A protein has these predicted regions:
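Short capping/connector residues at structural and topological boundaries
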Residues: 30, 55, 164-167
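Short alpha-helical "patches" and their helix-cap loops
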Residues: 52-59, 178-186
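Glycine/serine-rich phosphate-binding loop and adjoining beta1-alpha1 elements at the start
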Residues: 1-45
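Conserved catalytic alpha/beta core of Sir2/sirtuin-type deacylases, generalized to analogous enzyme cores
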Residues: 86, 166, 182-186
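Glycine-rich phosphate/diphosphate-binding loop of Rossmann-like nucleotide-binding domains
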Residues: 33-126, 131, 135-136, 140-145
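General beta-strand structural signal in soluble alpha/beta enzymes
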Residues: 1, 24-27, 32, 50, ...
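Generic secondary-structure signature for well-ordered alpha-helical cores
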Residues: 1, 16-21, 44-48, 73, ...
């Protein structure tokens, strides 16, 4: 079920059979979760080889954080996974230059600052939150998006577009099968 739902609907009370769970939200779904899959496709599209890289994954939700960590491990990454309160571990990992990639999906404005990105190659901002005026922000501070020495996904028009593209991909896989889709898109 696409979240968020209206407050009067409890997502736990809605049943989607695994065979049609194209969002990949259920752990037994045959489909990969759309947002983590979209993040992995971003790495593919920029030609960034994750093999052996040190990745800091911020956020441990069932929909994004945990499936993303699993996908990163399958790509032979060394993953440090923290939640939004994992500041000490995050600090030491980032400031000791141990991290090649930062992926933040905590939904907290300014969670990642330019000072956090010392020696980082790529920063993927998955988080979404809104200020008191309703303006959308990511997890990265505004100054991060202006950094020239690393690749940073845009806060608008970045991971969200990839999530929707992967949802469409999963729908096509449901209809035609994964082998046919691989033939079509390569």
């Amino acid at each position: 079920v696409q979240l968020p739902l209206p407050k009067h609907i409890n997502p736990q009370n809605i049943y989607i059979p695994d065979a049609v769970d194209v969002d990949g939200f259920n752990s037994t779904s045959p489909f990969q979760p759309c947002t983590p899959l979209g993040v992995m496709k971003i790495f593919d599209s920029i030609g960034y080889d994750l093999d052996g890289k040190n990745v800091l994954a911020c956020g441990q939700s069932d929909i994004v954080g945990r499936p993303l960590v699993d996908m990163l491990i399958k790509r032979h990454c060394n993953v440090i996974s923290v939640n939004s309160s994992g500041n000490a571990l995050r600090y030491y990992a980032l400031h000791d230059g141990l991290v090649d990639v930062v992926i933040s999906a905590v939904g907290e404005r300014d969670f990642i600052s330019p000072l956090d990105l010392f020696n980082v190659d790529v920063c993927i901002d998955v988080g979404i939150n809104y200020d008191e005026n309703g303006k959308q922000h990511g997890d990265c501070a505004d100054a991060v998006y202006n950094m020239k020495d690393i690749k940073v996904t845009p806060r608008i028009g970045g991971v969200g577009l990839m999530t929707r593209a992967m949802l469409l991909y999963n729908v096509c896989v449901a209809k035609y099968g994964e082998h046919k889709m691989e033939e079509v898109i390569g």
